[in-house]
Regions:
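Walker A/P-loop
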Residues: 28-47
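Inter-Walker segment of RecA-like/P-loop motor cores
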Residues: 70-71, 76-103
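Post-DEXD/H (motif II) to motif III coupling segment of the RecA-like Helicase ATP-binding lobe
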Residues: 117-170
Length: 187
């Protein structure tokens, strides 16, 4: 089963989004998580990947720019993800070497772009049993052609206004530094 457990502290709204996505994937194969910049997307991504990997699953992680793969590796390493279970590739590269990849249990796409829907679809069609989880900060219309080709449902995070009003506009690195310092104080 794909159930993944929360291992590090997510904000309530982040946990809710991840839970909604998890729930959809019990019956469907693709979900897009749409959440604005500053909502702590990297934490949610790390959560999804870590829990899948902890169950022995392989992940294909698609980034839309090669430079981002370094950033993603850092995020995952920081959350103790076993990187030997994760292939981090641009969609072009993934498409070119699909036949060499370990078939993934989940394909995670960061910054899912409509313009690349065709390439994604080629990859998804090659791995028909893989679940698809996309993350984007850009609103998509759930009934648009590009969307329905790739995903079954969309879950939406809070608005930027809500994040600001609730003091939750996350700069995750800052938050983790603060938490680390607090733990030293307790000793």
């Amino acid at each position: 089963s794909v159930m993944w457990m929360t291992t590090f502290k997510l904000y309530d709204y982040q946990e809710k989004l991840v839970d909604q996505a998890r729930h959809i994937l019990l019956n469907k194969s693709g979900v897009l998580i749409q959440s604005p910049p500053g909502s702590g997307k990297s934490v949610m991504i790390a959560e999804v990947v870590k829990n899948a990997v902890n169950k022995g699953n392989h992940i294909l992680f698609i980034v839309h720019r090669k430079e981002l793969s370094h950033q993603i590796k850092n995020t995952l390493t920081k959350h103790d993800v076993d990187l030997s279970q994760v292939d981090i590739l641009s969609e072009k590269r993934a498409k070119n070497i699909m036949h060499k990849l370990t078939p993934p249990k989940i394909i995670v796409t960061d910054e899912t772009h409509r313009s690349r829907a065709k390439t994604y679809k080629d990859i998804y069609d090659y791995f028909p049993n893989a679940l698809r989880v996309g993350f984007t900060a850009t609103p998509w219309r759930a009934n648009s052609k590009g969307f329905t080709d790739i995903y079954d449902e969309m879950v939406k995070g809070p608005s930027v206004e809500w994040l600001i009003n609730n003091n939750k506009l996350a700069d995750y690195d800052y938050k983790s530094v603060v938490l680390a310092d607090e733990s030293k104080l307790k000793k």
